[in-house]
Structures are given as C-alpha cells and as structure tokens.
Amino acid sequence: MEERTFWLVWSQISGVGPILLRRLQQHFGTLGAAWEASPAKLREVEGFGAKTVEAVVGKRSQIDPEKFLQQHLQKNPYFWTPADAEYPRLVLETPNPPAVLYYRGKVQPQENQGITPTVGIVGTRQPSEYGIRWTRRISAALAKQGFTIVSGMADGIDTEAHRACLEAGGRTLAVFGTGVDVVYPSHNRSLYEQILANGLVLSEYSAGTPPDRTRFPARNRIIAGLSRAVLVMEAPKKSGALITAQVANDFRRDVYALSARNDDYNFHGCLNLLVQGAKPIPIELDELLKMLGATPIKETENLGSLPLFAQSLPSNQPPLPDLEPELKQVFQAVSSEVLPFDLIVQKAGLAAGSVSSALLQLELMGLVTQLPGMRYQRC
C-alpha cells in the first residue's frame, strides 16, 4: 500500500494531529509501519499516552486502509499528503503541515515547489473604503508582477484581494475552513467559480465539512504556510487576521501591516503589529516590490533556470572560506543571486532544519544575508 493511504487513515483518528504524525514517522520510518505497531511500541512515542493509544487501537480495528481510501476517493478525488511529491513544499516545511490537503482548481507545479512567489493578503471582514482601496491596489499590482495571492475568501479584505487579483489577470489561492466543495460565505459563489477556473481552492477538511468558527484559526496557519510574506491590510485588535500574522511570524515569514490614524479602531490590530516589529506597507508600490525581494517577472519570459526572478550578470566569486563540511555544503548552495529557502534546501541536499541552522550560522559569520520572504544571497 502507498504511504499516502496511511497518512489518510491516521488523519481519521481523533487526537492524533500533524505534530504527533511527524513523531510517528520519525520513530517508525513510515506511517505504514506505525499503523502495524503494537500498543507497547506506540507508547514509546512522545505524546502517545494510554488514552491516545487506546483510541488508535480502537480505530484501527474499524478501518481497512485500502477500502477506506477507495471510499474516500468517491467524494474526495483530489488531495495531497506529505507522502506526495506534489504536496506544497512551503507548507511541508512548517511545524504542523496538514496530514491531508484537499484541493480543487488548477494546480501549478512551480507553485507547489515553492518557486512561484506567493503573498498572503488578509484582514477584517468589515473593512473601510481606505482598506478596500489599498487592498485592491496592492493585490492587482502584485498579480501583474507575477505573484500568486493567497487568502481565505472571507467577506471583506479576503474577497477584495481575490477579486482584484483575478481582475488583473493573476492567479489566486483560497484556503477554506470548510470542505473545498462548501462555498462560505454562500454569496461568494461566483468568486469561487472564478478561483476554480484561474487558481486553486484548498482545505484540510474533507468534502461536505460545514463552516464552524473553531476551524478558521487552523485554516489561517495554511494561509501563512503557503505565503512567503503576509500583508495585513486592516484589522481591529481581535481580528482573525492577527492569528495569520502571528503564525506567519512563527514560520519566519515576513509580516507587513497597513498603517492608518491612531484613533481608527479598525486599524488597532495593524498598529499593534507595527509596534511588535511588522514592516509598514509603503505608499509607493515599487518600494513594496523591492521589500518583497527580487522583482518577479512573468513566467512567459524565458530567463533560464530561475524564470520567475530577474537575473543579474554573472560575477567573479571570491574563494570559498574554510568551513565545516555541512556549512560549506549550504554555503555552496547559496549564490550572489537571490534564492528562496526551499531551493537552497534542494540544492544542498540536506534536511530543511539543518539548512535553516546552517544559514543562521552563515549569517552570523557575515557570509550570507537573509532577505524578505525567506530568500537568501551571499554577502
């Protein structure tokens, strides 16, 4: 049986979330092996106490993995698990990637590989004209420059971000807190159809899952995971957009916030983010593009191995410094060109955690610099 089948069946066990699944995978090598493990062996894994193991044993006796997969595919034909090569790389690198990620729409391989630049745009469901105007302006500008816009299709800022992106001829991803077949809010049906035709709808919840307020905070971590940077356009103090911003910061994504008057309640959340270190969204859009990293170009232009980023002329590199083997391996994967983190991981051939640690050491040594959007280049 394929490993993805076991990711699916393990996801059906209450109390066993993404973090415990990663521990199982690390302990047993595969989730298939974990599925066959005895209760005593399961208890060796951190987080698997008597109650959790009892739940696992009870559920395993009720599920035939292959039959469950075939039944599940009838209503959920399109999904990825971390065992699939197509699983979005940026989400996979987060601490708690969904065990199952359902999708509908048009898949773009470069997007899944983390090559296409992605920006999350989020905010309040009840925006001001000022917030709407800036959201539409920024979303359209980024879309025209080749960025994919990520949001949650909620009323307000999310909806405006998706619409402006589509109107500009761009591509957008909508992350749901429901099943991918459940349009919420229902009056966004037309927008939903447009996104399916030009982008992608994603969710960690299976088909038919209805809206529930408790699911939306978890949804926000996927928005943050898919995005190299998150822009909070308008948010009061208790806005759900602030959860997305916090998670994005935890994921080492860059967080930006739109500023306004201090007495404007609808922007108090944005002001708090700015106080905490978020970057202010500049008035000049060209400046924002620079802050987001190398100015992207359209995929239709062929500029070699990194088609989505402007390339500079080759330069003579200084001799390699004397480094420990792993540091040297990561340093060699970085160049004078701006490269995204996941591409450096791929070039280095090491685990993401090892690369992240090495990059930090190289930064402290003054050999590498980190740019917005988890991109790096040699100093």
Question: Across the structure, where does each feature detected by a protein language model lie?
Answer:
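Short, small/acidic-rich helices and loops at N termini and domain boundaries
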Residues: 1-85, 365-367, 372-379
